[in-house]
Amino acid sequence: MSSTTKPWAIISGAGPSGLLLGLLLAKKGIPIQLVDMSYELDKQPRATHYGPPAMYELRRAGVADEMREQGFFPNGVSWRKIDGTFLAGINVELTSDDPDRMTCLPLNKLGKILYEHISREPTATVSWGHKVVGLGQDDDKAWVDVETPQGPKKLEAEYIIGCDGANSQIRRSLFGDFEFPGKTWDEQIVATNTYYDFSPYNWEDSNFIIHPEHYYMAAKIGTDGLYRITYGEKPGLTLEQLKERQPMKFKEFLPGHPDPSQYKIVNFSPYKIHQRLAPSMRVGRFCLAADAAHLCNPFGGMGLTGGIVDVGGLYDCLAGIYEGLADPSILDKYAEIRAQKYNEIVNPISSDNIVRLNGQDPDKALENDEFLRMCKRAETDHEFAKQMQGGVNALKHDFTQYYKKKGTQNGSTENGDFLKQHHLPLQAAAAGGVNA
């Protein structure tokens, strides 16, 4: 996009959600500008697992093949006791013919792929070092006030989208710094990226360990032996105390009870976890998507998959408006339905995912936990297993049905009733993407 062309949409946040939305819009020929306060792409791996609804959107953007070249297909998921005893699992190989099969790739690598693609789009501009400090709108336009290396600027567009993460300045400016309804969990979580040899133990690529104190997740996130090991800790500890306790924790719960000489930690990130939803995902010409709009605990990767599905739905709405196929009121549908998906699917199921690990007796888990019993059934009933895994599509929604003319049916709720009926965790969640 030339320096004199006014963008039709401005996207705040050049992380993966903002880059994906920008790429989808730019591929339609829509002039867009991304602004980000950073001066480069985020280099942290963060989340890693993309469920089928997310891969559908990434395939629409034309990046799925490159993701799979650089990443891999996880082979399955298990729930275990702390001694490694297998309780139940999900065989994702049953859906190996799905064009949107779950894929694992660190988020920073996806960001690089998306940035390379959007850089080739003539209607897209990415402006680094642009910090949003204020915003406004009237009947004709919306704007953001930004601090830039060249001084303060006022940037205008028809629509402005906040894809600027959990600490979203767009959301804060719309609703106030502390207006993000929901809760913060008492649990202290520590996410690590660790090289450790799990091969002697014949575990799946993603594993959840049920224990009241030493619950954790171990998920393969690379083809070079790198695992995301994320575990629960005592609340109230300092960073130094958490680091001091880490060798004890690993020796206590990892298979083989290793000493520090037997593994290599390359990233150590303690954080608190939240369940929160913005008061609205639309205010006039402003919209929110992904972490800027809602948060959930990371056990299950539902924040990543759900956020990408937000972006795909918002793209269909904005593209419909731009092409004259939809009225601006379609954005009210976006805000309503994406909030509904959070409240009915993402929030309760992601909450169940962590309570399943630390809120029950592992010796009675198969007896008391309906989901684990269903996983056991699915081990021998493959048709039932496919229905379970297909339930993930309940996250999707076809916003083109609200076009004035018949849309392209970009979205599906296939098997969604099954998911709601059985209150199932998404298989994307089961793979254990973690935002560290």
Where are these regions (language model features)?
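Glycine-rich FAD pyrophosphate-binding loop
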Residues: 26-47
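Beta1/beta-strand and adjacent pyrophosphate-binding region of the FAD-binding site
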Residues: 2-17
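C-terminal helical "tail/cap" subdomain of flavin- and related membrane-associated enzymes
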Residues: 5, 317-436
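General small-molecule cofactor/ligand-binding pocket signal
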Residues: 68, 125-127, 181, 266
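Active-site-adjacent segment of FAD-dependent monooxygenases/related oxidoreductases
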Residues: 43-46, 50-119, 136, 220, ...
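A conserved beta-strand/loop element that lines the FAD pocket in flavoprotein oxidoreductases
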Residues: 119-133
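Conserved mid-domain beta->alpha element of the FAD-binding
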Residues: 14-23, 27-31, 58, 114, ...
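Conserved FAD-binding catalytic core of PHBH/FMO-like flavoproteins
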Residues: 116, 134, 139-143, 147-153, ...
